[in-house]
Design a protein with these regions (language model features):
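N-terminal DNA-binding recognition helix of tyrosine site-specific recombinases/integrases
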Residues: 35, 46-53, 60, 68-71, ...
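Short, aromatic/basic-rich helix-turn unit that serves as a nucleic-acid recognition element
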Residues: 8-45
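Short basic/aromatic active-site micro-motif
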Residues: 65-68, 90, 148-152, 224-228, ...
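Short, surface-exposed polybasic/aromatic micro-patch for ligand or macromolecular engagement
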Residues: 1
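A Lys/Arg-rich helix-loop hairpin that forms a DNA/phosphate-binding surface
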Residues: 5-15, 35-38, 51-75, 222, ...
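Conserved tyrosine-mediated DNA breakage-rejoining catalytic core shared by Y-recombinases
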Residues: 123-126, 132, 159, 168-208
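Basic, Lys/Arg- and aromatic-enriched nucleic-acid-binding interface segment
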Residues: 85, 89-91, 108, 112-163, ...
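C-terminal catalytic core of Y-nucleophile DNA break-rejoin enzymes
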Residues: 189-208, 215-236, 248-250
């Protein structure tokens, strides 16, 4: 009963996480991206799996959380789930957000995980050189869908748009000024901050390639699938372009 938090004055960990997710979901499409929501949801599910694995419970009261809980959680993520340190670091940050919330709301007298830190060990991220980007642009691809994904990648490279921003980009977000130059005027999916980006020749060429599908509000790039499936498609692009590594859509921005 102590783990389950019996009593009206007990707040539960996953209960609080679920409330946070519900609030986050309401902001998706406004100042939050669905991909960020999905990231939090997956971390929540890892935590639920750990509670079942280690304690055989569906939830746990904040007042029952001690230092060894988070230490065991790190071991579980590494040994059972096979996560790397960067992903573990991200998962622990989400857990610590919940305990900090509990502390700030007065549900517990102190944050049990304050000062706990997992050092991420990221591998060096590769970026495309000018010649590699040109190879991607010139690659002969096997099908239309892979071509769309390649074009979206190149468009991001010449505009600095993120995956979330290019997915939601519509023809209505692109304006032509008095000089005949085209600009993207939109808001960042993740932060809600307005931005303006002038279309350089390559980006404008790609826009022209797809603008014949124009209808009010229609997306510029008819992308399907998730961030993960797009990156899987880019692996095929990399192979046809003769690249020595597999770029992700994030690489396009740098």
């Amino acid at each position: 009963n102590a783990f389950l938090g019996m009593g009206d004055d007990c707040r539960l960990l996953l209960q609080t996480f679920d409330e946070y997710l519900a609030g986050f979901l309401k902001r998706v499409g406004k100042d939050r991206a669905y991909s960020s929501y999905d990231n939090y949801r997956k971390r929540r599910n890892r935590l639920a799996s750990f509670l079942e694995y280690e304690y055989r419970v569906k939830d746990i009261a904040f007042k029952e959380l001690k230092r060894d809980f988070i230490e065991k959680f790190v071991v579980y993520l590494s040994s059972v789930q096979g996560m790397r340190s960067g992903t573990i670091h991200s998962t622990i940050k989400k857990l610590k957000l919940m305990t900090y919330t509990a502390y700030k709301n007065g549900w517990i007298p102190a944050d049990p995980f304050a000062g706990f830190y997992v050092r991420p060990e990221y591998s060096e991220r590769r970026y495309l050189s000018a010649s590699e980007l040109q190879a991607v642009m010139d690659a002969e691809l096997p099908n239309y869908r892979t071509g769309i994904n390649r074009d979206a990648f190149v468009f991001c490279a010449f505009t600095g748009l993120s995956h979330a921003d290019v997915v939601k980009l519509t023809h209505a977000d692109i304006y032509t000024d008095d000089n005949g130059e085209r600009w993207i005027i939109d808001r960042r999916q993740k932060t809600g901050t307005q931005f303006r980006v002038k279309l350089l020749p390559v980006a404008e060429m790609l826009y022209e390639r797809y603008k014949d599908t124009y209808r009010t509000g229609e997306k510029v790039f008819p992308l399907k699938g998730t961030y993960k499936t797009l990156n899987m498609s880019l692996r095929h692009v990399a192979r046809h372009a003769g690249l020595s590594f597999n770029p992700t859509i994030h690489c396009a921005r740098h």
